[in-house]
Amino acid sequence: MEIILVGHAHTAKAFKEAVEMIYGEVPNFHPIDFTPKEGLQSLTDKIVSAIEPGKTASTLIITDLFSGTPYNASAELVLKKKAADVVAGMCLPMLLEVAVNANNMSVSQLVSHLMKIKEEFSTSLSEKMTTNAKEDDF
């Protein structure tokens, strides 16, 4: 499975570097940064260039923000069948989950898995402490 990361400024490249720092090399992750000097068409062209011929059905695009330019460009490509799916809300825990599972699941299985566990990607110390205190009461 090929994973294309698309984000504002240099978030895509930074996220790939962070994943590699923790997980190891991820050659199937392809970061695309959307800079202030670019428009929708130039970003779309960069994404199309990153999709390997013959691998559209096994290409997942992950963007930083729902409804932002990276997401909109990616969604258009998915609707045109140039990629399998697009997921918004890129974060390090999500990308580590993708790195672990990308070679063991299809795109649709991985997307379904991510949607099931997405609430595990963030937490609050005070919430954890409250939950643990309630559990200790029993």
Curated annotation (Swiss-Prot):
GO cellular component terms, semicolon-separated: cytoplasm; membrane
Pfam family, one: EIIA-man
Positions bearing Phosphohistidine: H8
CDD domains cross-referenced by the UniProt entry: PTS_IIA_man
GO terms for biological process, alphabetical: phosphoenolpyruvate-dependent sugar phosphotransferase system
The keyword Iron-sulfur appears for this protein: no
Signal peptide start and end residues: none
PANTHER family: PTS PERMEASE-RELATED-RELATED, PTS SYSTEM MANNOSE-SPECIFIC EIIAB COMPONENT-RELATED
Function summary: The phosphoenolpyruvate-dependent sugar phosphotransferase system (PTS), a major carbohydrate active transport system, catalyzes the phosphorylation of incoming sugar substrates concomitant with their translocation across the cell membrane. The enzyme II SorABCD PTS system is involved in L-sorbose transport.
Name of the protein in question: PTS system sorbose-specific EIIA component
Gene name, Swiss-Prot/TrEMBL: sorA
